[in-house]
């Protein structure tokens, strides 16, 4: 096959490209120029968009003897990832930009261009396993990236290859060393690529501006003022501008964010326990495939744990989410309702709920949805039905 190897400049994509070549495919290397901000592209910046990363990717391609190109998707990245990130925080959501980038850039923009140019597939260094259309977690549990691929469609997966998913990270580094790749010991990137200094609140403040509001406790009493709800996320404990502990001597956490009123509610850790989740913008979840109700496991963070749940797929006629975002006409007509069998802590609107089917050969990824509402956990059991759930905006 003729394939495009997406080369970030890291060790995983380098080995993925090498394995695709060794498998007999015709390979070209492509580095994506995504962010044009001076902070992101400067030499020495640790992200996936810096000049250093592009140079590292080119050196690997030269070592492999494959053609190398830089494709500029910066305008689309700004519109589909950065602006979406800012808009989501402005309405009190907590988005994951890596999922959005995978959905709109790496496996839409890149894949569409690749297919248009006559290529058959895109190769990446993600730690996930894909065989015959079935995606499983990567063998390396510490590096598994199936969660951030949960937004892909069946059509996109039909043109994807993940050559490193069957291998653990130390072996990938050894393989890169054997090939003489200079990136063999290059550290992994953990920061948001367009916020390489890690100062997310400052970045959002510049984009959104001051939107003062009140911080209240569980009984509605005002305890402080704030500059904007974008500076907070559900479950946050640090950076609240409050004494570390309340009058009861217990730590305080952000338990709710109401962007419409500018109110941030704080409470105790137990107030963060969630027993029910409602999600929309579904990917790969369809009653015709999975049935109206099924048992599963759900994960809500890239490196978070999983809990068992009962899932239901129900009609979703609503065109506006509780946070105020108008749904697009091409979005799934279904919504996902999850009754958790164990509580999850600090689940936020805007996060992805990725659903798996437990399997001895590796959990199978069924699909995902974007969380739009939660219901509290009850010590007597999970939350009530979706019809009984109060969304944060209604609580």
UniProtKB/Swiss-Prot annotation:
Keywords: ATP-binding, Cytoplasm, Disulfide bond, Nucleotide-binding, RNA-binding, Transferase, tRNA processing, tRNA-binding. Gene3D superfamilies: Adenine nucleotide alpha hydrolases-like domains, HUPs, Translation factors. The record marks 126, 351 as: Interaction with tRNA. One of its GO terms (cellular component) is cytoplasm. GO terms for molecular function: ATP binding; tRNA binding; tRNA-uridine 2-sulfurtransferase activity. One of its GO terms (biological process) is tRNA wobble position uridine thiolation. InterPro entries: MnmA-like, MnmA-like_C, MnmA-like_central, MnmA-like_central_sf, Rossmann-like_a/b/a_fold. It holds the Pfam family tRNA_Me_trans_C. Signal peptide: none annotated. This is tRNA-specific 2-thiouridylase MnmA. It comes from Corynebacterium jeikeium (strain K411).
């Amino acid at each position: 096959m003729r394939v495009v190897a997406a080369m970030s400049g890291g060790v995983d994509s380098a080995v993925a490209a090498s394995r695709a070549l060794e498998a007999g495919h015709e390979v070209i290397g492509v580095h994506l120029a995504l962010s044009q901000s001076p902070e992101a592209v400067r030499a020495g910046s640790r992200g996936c968009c810096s000049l250093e990363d592009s140079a590292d990717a080119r050196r690997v391609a030269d070592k492999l003897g494959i053609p190398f190109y830089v494709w500029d998707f910066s305008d689309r990245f700004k519109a589909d990832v950065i602006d979406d990130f800012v808009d989501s925080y402005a309405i009190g959501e907590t988005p994951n930009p890596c999922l959005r980038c995978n959905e709109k850039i790496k496996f839409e923009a890149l894949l569409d261009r690749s297919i248009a140019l006559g290529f058959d597939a895109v190769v990446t260094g993600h730690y996930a396993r894909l065989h015959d259309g079935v995606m499983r977690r990567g063998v390396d549990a510490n590096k598994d990236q199936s969660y951030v691929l949960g937004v892909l469609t069946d059509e996109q997966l039909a043109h994807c290859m993940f050559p490193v998913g069957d291998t653990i990270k130390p072996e990938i580094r050894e393989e890169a060393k054997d090939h003489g790749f200079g990136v063999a010991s290059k550290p992994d990137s953990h920061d948001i690529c367009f916020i390489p200094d890690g100062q997310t609140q400052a970045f959002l403040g510049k984009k959104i501006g001051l939107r003062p509001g009140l911080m209240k406790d569980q009984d509605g009493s005002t305890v402080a003022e704030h500059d904007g709800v974008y500076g907070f996320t559900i479950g946050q404990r640090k950076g609240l501008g409050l004494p570390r502990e309340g009058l009861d001597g217990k730590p305080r956490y952000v338990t709710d964010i109401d962007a419409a009123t500018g109110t941030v509610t704080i409470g105790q850790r137990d107030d963060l326990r969630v027993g029910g989740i409602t999600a929309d913008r579904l990917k790969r979840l369809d009653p015709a495939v999975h049935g109206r109700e099924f048992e599963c496991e759900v994960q809500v963070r890239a490196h978070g744990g999983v809990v068992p749940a009962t899932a239901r797929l129900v009609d979703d006629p609503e065109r506006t989410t509780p946070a105020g975002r108008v749904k697009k006409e091409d979005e799934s007509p279904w919504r996902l309702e999850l009754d958790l069998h164990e509580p999850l802590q600090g689940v936020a609107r805007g996060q992805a709920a990725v659903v798996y089917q437990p399997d001895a050969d590796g959990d199978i990824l069924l699909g995902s949805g974007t969380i739009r509402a939660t219901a509290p956990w009850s010590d007597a059991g999970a939350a009530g039905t979706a019809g009984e759930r109060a969304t944060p905006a209604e609580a």
